[in-house]
C-alpha cells in the first residue's frame, strides 16, 4: 500500500505559482470529493496554506503516480499556462511520512519553528475526515505527525525565541521589565507592525496600552480590539511621554517622531525612572541621540535583528534532535505499514484453522454432552492459539525490511495452502 505526496511550497516555486495552485477550504473539499468518487484515490488529504499546497494520496488505480497527480491538480486549477510539473516535489511511501513529520514539526517552514503550521495540518486532516477521504493509512499518518510535533515542542527548543521584529521587541521588554502588566505602554503607529507588537504585548499580560496614530480611527479600532480603549491624539502625544515605561514606535516617516529634547524633558518629569524605547520603524522613528540620556534604553531594528539571528541560530542547533524524533517515529510508522501488508495473510491463516476446528467439532456435536463440547471448544482454541503464535509472530516481526515481506508472506501462504482458502471464499 503506497502513499504519495506531491505539491508546491516555498522551496520549489515562487509565490505567483503557489498562489495559482492554492486551494481554498471549499475548493479542497470539492477536490477531495472528485478524486475519491472518480477512483483516483482511496484516501486523500489537501494541505493548502500561503506557503504550500500539498496532496497526500493513497492511489486508487495503478496508473496514479506522482506525475499523474501533478498534472491532475494543474488541470483542475486550469493553470496549464503558468504551472509546470517541475514546480512540484514528489514523495513516496516513507519519504511521504518523513515530509509530513517535518512539515508538522515546523522544520520545513519558511520561518524555522513557526507555530502555525501544526494547526494548519490538523485543519487539513479535519477536512479529510469530514469528506470521508481519510482512511486507516492517512489517519495513522496524521496522528503520528501530531505526536511528532508534540514531542518536538516538548523535547527541543526549536519553537523558542522570537524570530519576528515585533515579537523580539516584546520579548526584550519582558526581559527588562519582567512583569509587563505593571507597566504603562505607548504604541506610536497602528499599522501592521504596531498592531502585531500590541497583540504580542497583550499576550504577555500587558493591559495598560495607549495607542496614537496619525489616523485616529485606526488607533481607536485597534484599542477597541485589544479592549484598552485608550488613545491619544497624534499631534499632542509628546505632552504625555513622561507617563510611559515602554514606548514602541512603528510609523512610516522621514523625520524622527521622538527627538532627544522630547525625551530629555520627559525624563525630568519622570525623575529618571527607566524607559525602554523600541523603534520598529524603517527609516528609524527615533533620534539615536536619545541613547545618551540617562536611564533611557533605545533599541532599533538592527538591535532586534541581532536577537532574531541568535534565536534562529539556536533553533537551527536543535535540528539534529528533531531529526532523531522524526527517525524514531518513522521506524514505528514503517513497522505499522508492514503489518498492514501481512494482515490479509494473518486473517486467512486464522480463518483456515478456525474452519478446521469448526468442522472437527461438528463431527462430535451429537456424540457428546453440551458441557463436554464447550470443554472441547476451549481446548481447541488454546491449541490453535499456540499453533498460530509462531507463524503470526514471524509475519509481524519488525526486523524485516519491506523487501522481505512478500517472500515471507508467500512462504506462509504456500506452507498452509492459503490460496485454496481464498478460492473457497470466492
UniProtKB/Swiss-Prot annotation:
GO molecular function, one term: glutamyl-tRNA reductase activity
Keyword presence, NADP: yes
Name under which the protein is recorded: Glutamyl-tRNA reductase
Active-site residues (renumbered): 50 (nucleophile)
Species per Swiss-Prot/TrEMBL record: Prosthecochloris aestuarii (strain DSM 271 / SK 413)
Superkingdom of this protein's organism: Bacteria
The UniProt record lists the keyword Transmembrane: no
Domain notes: Possesses an unusual extended V-shaped dimeric structure with each monomer consisting of three distinct domains arranged along a curved 'spinal' alpha-helix. The N-terminal catalytic domain specifically recognizes the glutamate moiety of the substrate. The second domain is the NADPH-binding domain, and the third C-terminal domain is responsible for dimerization.
Residues that hold substrate according to the record: 49-52, 109, 114-116, 120
Quaternary state and interactors: Homodimer.
Amino acid at each position: 500500500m503506497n502513499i504519495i505526496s506531491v505539491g508546491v511550497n516555498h522551496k520549489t516555486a515562487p509565490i505567483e505559482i503557489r498562489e495559482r495552485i492554492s486551494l481554498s477550504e471549499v475548493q479542497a473539499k470539492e477536490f477531495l470529493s472528485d478524486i475519491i468518487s472518480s477512483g483516483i484515490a482511496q484516501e486523500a488529504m489537501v494541505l493548502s496554506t500561503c506557503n504550500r499546497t500539498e496532496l497526500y494520496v493513497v492511489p486508487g488505480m495503478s496508473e496514479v503516480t506522482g506525475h499523474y497527480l501533478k498534472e491532475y491538480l494543474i488541470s483542475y486549477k486550469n493553470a496549464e499556462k503558468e504551472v509546470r510539473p517541475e514546480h512540484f516535489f514528489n514523495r513516496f511511501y516513507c519519504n511521504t511520512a518523513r515530509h509530513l513529520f517535518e512539515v508538522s514539526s515546523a522544520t520545513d517552514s519558511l520561518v524555522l519553528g513557526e507555530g502555525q503550521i501544526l494547526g494548519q495540518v490538523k485543519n487539513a486532516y479535519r477536512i479529510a475526515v469530514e469528506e470521508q477521504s481519510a482512511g486507516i493509512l492517512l489517519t495513522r499518518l496524521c496522528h503520528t505527525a501530531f505526536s511528532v510535533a508534540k514531542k518536538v515542542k516538548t523535547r527541543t527548543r526549536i519553537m523558542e525565541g522570537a524570530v519576528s521584529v515585533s515579537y523580539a521587541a516584546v520579548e526584550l521588554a519582558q526581559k527588562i521589565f519582567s512583569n509587563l502588566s505593571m507597566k504603562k505602554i505607548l504604541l506610536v503607529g497602528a499599522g501592521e507592525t504596531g498592531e502585531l507588537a500590541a497583540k504580542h504585548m497583550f499576550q504577555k499580560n500587558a493591559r495598560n496600552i495607549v495607542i496614537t496614530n496619525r489616523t485616529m480611527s485606526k488607533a481607536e479600532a485597534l484599542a477597541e480590539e485589544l479592549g484598552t480603549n485608550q488613545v491619544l491624539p497624534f499631534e499632542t502625544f509628546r505632552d504625555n511621554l513622561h507617563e510611559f515605561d515602554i514606548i514602541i514606535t512603528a510609523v512610516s516617516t522621514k523625520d524622527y517622531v521622538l527627538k532627544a529634547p522630547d525625551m530629555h524633558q520627559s525624563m525630568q518629569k519622570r525623575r529618571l525612572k527607566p524607559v525602554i524605547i523600541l523603534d520598529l520603524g524603517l527609516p528609524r522613528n527615533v533620534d539615536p541621540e536619545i541613547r545618551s540620556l540617562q536611564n533611557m534604553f533605545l533599541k532599533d531594528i538592527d538591535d532586534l535583528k541581532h536577537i532574531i539571528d541568535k534565536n534562529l541560530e539556536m533553533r537551527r542547533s536543535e535540528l539534529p534532535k528533531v531529526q532523531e524524533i522524526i527517525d524514531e517515529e518513522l521506524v514505528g510508522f514503517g513497522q505499522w505499514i508492514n503489518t498492514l501488508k501481512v494482515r490479509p495473510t494473518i486473517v486467512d491463516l486464522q480463518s483456515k484453522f478456525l474452519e478446521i476446528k469448526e468442522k472437527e467439532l461438528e463431527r462430535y456435536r451429537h456424540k457428546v454432552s453440551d458441557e463436554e463440547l464447550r470443554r472441547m471448544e476451549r481446548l481447541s482454541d488454546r491449541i490453535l492459539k499456540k499453533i498460530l503464535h509462531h507463524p503470526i509472530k514471524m509475519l509481524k516481526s519488525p526486523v524485516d525490511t519491506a523487501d522481505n515481506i512478500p517472500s515471507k508472506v508467500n512462504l506462509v501462504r504456500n506452507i498452509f495452502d492459503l490460496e485454496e482458502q481464498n478460492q473457497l471464499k470466492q
